[in-house]
């Protein structure tokens, strides 16, 4: 463990449950790296991800974005390709992009959008894009004919959330430079979406634990009962 991390850890009471504002203030204070660290939210949910009816997945536009310049790749043809280019997509194409990704192991983009008619083509990339979380999905709004709106939302700060195998959701909610107030608003937007996404099949306590941390910093626990206060 680095010296900075140990110093930062002393600022956080490991047994305390903080309000979102208190926890985020600590996350900002403990971000000691020389770069503008990302502030991340970690939520352990009371679901069993092995069951299809207990999956938690979706997307939400953060009011202040993520602070990251997001590169969008769009699979579309004809008019929809023109729409995507006009809306500010970084890369637009069809079969030639599939070949480039397969042949060159090319991943110079953050989000992939596809029109529904292109999913047969994109499906060939399942094994490549799937493990990286880049496969377009209707639940997150990345399989759509409304490519212009999808690109606009992604560029404005839309983030995808998805429960992993250990029932945890990890998601960026901004940068250290945002300051506590903007981070709290982003935090609440994401928590609101997570609460609304609770599967009907989930039993017992849904929000098991909530914490925030800077990329290189220690975690501060948030009281699950106060996440939307």
Curated annotation (Swiss-Prot):
Q: Which residues form a coiled coil?
A: none
SUPFAM superfamilies for the chain: Ribosomal protein L1 (SSF56808)
Biological process terms in GO annotation: regulation of translation; translation
Pfam families to which the protein is assigned, alphabetical: Ribosomal_L1
Q: Which cellular component appears as one GO term in the record?
A: large ribosomal subunit
**Record keywords, A-Z:** Repressor, Ribonucleoprotein, Ribosomal protein, RNA-binding, rRNA-binding, Translation regulation, tRNA-binding
What GO terms are given for molecular function?
rRNA binding; structural constituent of ribosome; tRNA binding
Q: Which family does it belong to?
A: Belongs to the universal ribosomal protein uL1 family.
Q: How does it assemble?
A: Part of the 50S ribosomal subunit.
Q: What does this protein do?
A: Binds directly to 23S rRNA. The L1 stalk is quite mobile in the ribosome, and is involved in E site tRNA release.
PANTHER family the UniProt entry points to: 54S RIBOSOMAL PROTEIN L1, MITOCHONDRIAL, LARGE RIBOSOMAL SUBUNIT PROTEIN UL1M
The record's annotation in HAMAP family points to: Ribosomal_uL1_B (MF_01318_B)
Q: What name does this protein carry?
A: Large ribosomal subunit protein uL1
Q: Which gene encodes it?
A: rplA
